[in-house]
Amino acid sequence: MMTSMTALIADDEPLLRHHLNRMLADVWPELEVVALVGDGQQALTSIEQLQPDIVFLDIRMPELDGIAVAKQLNRGEYRPTIVFVTAYDEYAVKAFEQQAIDYLMKPLSEARLIDTCQRIKARQQPTVSPPDVGALLSQLQALSKPAQPQYLQWIRAALGDDIHLISVNDVLYFKAEEKYVTVHTLAKKEFLIRMSLKELLAQLDPERFWQIHRASVVNVAAIEKVQKDFTGRMSVTVGEQKLPVSRGSQHLFKGM
């Protein structure tokens, strides 16, 4: 006969904590929920004190998120069964499934909860191997990292009837010309791009290219000189050109 089990629920949304607690009372009356907590740090403290058999762990929580809590538990001596409560997309769910980890998707489904509870009970049998929590956490951590933005490295631009591929390293500055943008390069050539300056700017690395005027975007590395006259007007010298800097963009050169 299986001994009664205990559980802890960690979720920063009070309504969801209590909702899950009520659902567990319905689908698994023998399960004793020993604590409801609202953040990751409270979860770790309560788990250490109460040592529940099961932890229902929301992934996104203040203080420590669910992944950080699970990583700490996975390194410790006491390792409860973890059920992640998640609003993650399908790719993360596949990671759960590959590692045979229990998870509940928000909004909570009673059918899914029943299935999870049955799997937990079955897993108490000594012949069942424990899931590889560490491998799952590594996958989740990778999924949690924001993707690095991909900025333009090469630009397709026209010179006469020909299309050229220009490295952004060779660009001095871009200048808006009605429906086009002209590309001014180190080779003292001017190319045309058929897009607005706003569209182009969204694809450029903001650390390398600054919009200094509504009509101009300059390669910061190409700036040779910054000047300010007695009236407060600022300009930069790029190549052989002197380009005006709008008052709204002068903060970019503070400290220069």
UniProtKB/Swiss-Prot annotation:
Gene3D superfamilies: 3.40.50.2300, LytTr DNA-binding domain (2.40.50.1020)
GO biological process: regulation of DNA-templated transcription
A Pfam family it matches: Response_reg
GO MF terms, alphabetically ordered: phosphorelay response regulator activity; transcription cis-regulatory region binding
Annotated ranges, domain Response regulatory: 6-121
Cited SMART domains: LytTR (SM00850), REC (SM00448)
Any one Gene Ontology cellular component term annotated for this protein: protein-DNA complex
Stretches assigned to the HTH LytTR-type domain: 155-256
4-aspartylphosphate carried by residues: 58
Protein name: Uncharacterized response regulatory protein VV2_1193
Species of the source: Vibrio vulnificus (strain CMCP6)
